[in-house]
């Protein structure tokens, strides 16, 4: 075997990169030899914005050192939780069932107060033709234009209301929503839209928003679809599929060589829908996290 430099596959560790493609403008990302530190000093409680992404799956006896590193680089800025992420590859034809974790890593993580959970990252292979049948109007939401209360601002507000259905379908579920967190997330999307890195799409039925999603990208050819939400009364009508297809197709028109990804819980509806649209499993991202501090 040659002793020359190893050439990495272009898509190595692309699963974690997909999860970072839509980070907010106030999130700091720094690269080290064995990890990528993601920090959001203004929101130390934000899980996706305060995490240590490892460049390789850790051995059981390495976890404690990474937890210490998290404390030094992220916890010192106020994060009350610990979160480590790493990825393991999946075959494109891998089943939707969750991958099996390394039992020794899980045991050691538990001893450190961390729970390990999987997330499937899928990448677009070939976009399947639209299924049709969704009786909705699909429309991109314009970037904010600086006119509070104007038509564009009202469009953003209308799509934001749909976030309540992430928590559940009933008013009791909605009362548990963290409205401040949703407002902050939407404001970050608005800022990304202003600089051309986020496109929100809405599905309208009789002029009313019944579905929405966000497609964000990093300006370097990697895009991620997030926050696909459909009103409970309008589900199982092909709206989510229609939204996904339109958003991805539109992005590929602007950047034909883009890699488009989506993260979903293994075997979930989002996982199965992505596969039907032509996205294929790429990696399992393992998330080892502690409970939030009281």
Residue ranges and their predicted role:
Residues 56, 62-161, 261, 268-270, ...:
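Acyl-donor-binding surface of acyltransferase catalytic domains
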Residues 1-77, 81, 90-102:
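N-terminal charged segments
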Residues 63-71, 227-232, 236-253, 276:
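Conserved acetyl-CoA-binding loop-helix of GNAT-fold acetyltransferases
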